[in-house]
Amino acid sequence: MSEAALTRSQVAAMVDHTLLKPEATAADVTALIDEARSLGVLAVCVSPSMLPIRADGLVTAAVVGFPSGKHHSLVKGAEARLAVDQGATEIDMVIDVGAAVAGDYSAVLADILTVREAMGESAILKVILETAALSDEAIVECCRAAVRAGANFVKTSTGFHPAGGATVEAVELMARTVGPGVGVKASGGIRTTQAALDMIAAGATRLGLSGTRAVLDGLTD
């Protein structure tokens, strides 16, 4: 699908409307859910502590090991299992970025496998790589580990790392590496319509956005 062919509703159907600020309140998350419904997006992505707030009619994603990825793998697994039990249908987990930087891809694989096994097969697993902090080689190897572990998506960024967020180059590399059977979620710093379209053109099949309205307002149906 070309950029010119994309309508507002088509892009909205790729969006995880996201609120992960540590100061977010229950009222903020309720407002996020209401806005997500009004915008017609696919999903909301929230902190697991906010899962008791119902988001009927929307896919609900929760983050795990967020944002550092330095939690013990068993803690990540328990967090993912609890999130699924509380209604999350998708899990966005952060890898141990330090292990990736060190080239310890066996540890990266084991970390992802622990979460995948703990959460079960009923929910979608997205694996956050923090690509701005990684070399191209590390991005490729972490993508391969995610595929081997049974992930459904690889994801660029938490949006909280000082190295930055999603780039077209990282998305292209991830899409080439995982192939058509695994999705690519671009997130972190996508604030304009053109930036979103550029990510889609590069191979992103899902977008993590906090400023969703501003992005969608640049499109028509």
Curated annotation (Swiss-Prot):
It is an enzyme of class 4 (lyase). Pathway: Carbohydrate degradation; 2-deoxy-D-ribose 1-phosphate degradation; D-glyceraldehyde 3-phosphate and acetaldehyde from 2-deoxy-alpha-D-ribose 1-phosphate: step 2/2. Its main location: cytoplasm. Disulfide bonds: none annotated. It is found in: Cytoplasm. InterPro entries: Aldolase_TIM, DeoC, DeoC/FbaB/LacD_aldolase, DeoC_typeI. It catalyses: 2-deoxy-D-ribose 5-phosphate = D-glyceraldehyde 3-phosphate + acetaldehyde. Signal peptide: none annotated. CDD domains: DeoC (cd00959). The active site is at D92 (proton donor/acceptor), K155 (schiff-base intermediate with acetaldehyde), K185 (proton donor/acceptor). Optimum pH is 7.0. Inhibited by tetrahydrofurane, acetonitrile and isopropanol. GO terms for molecular function: deoxyribose-phosphate aldolase activity. GO terms for cellular component: cytoplasm. One of its GO terms (biological process) is carbohydrate catabolic process. It comes from the Bacteria. Catalyzes a reversible aldol reaction between acetaldehyde and D-glyceraldehyde 3-phosphate to generate 2-deoxy-D-ribose 5-phosphate. HAMAP family: DeoC_type1. NCBIfam families: deoC. Belongs to the DeoC/FbaB aldolase family. DeoC type 1 subfamily. Homodimer. This is Deoxyribose-phosphate aldolase. It comes from Rhodococcus erythropolis (strain PR4 / NBRC 100887).
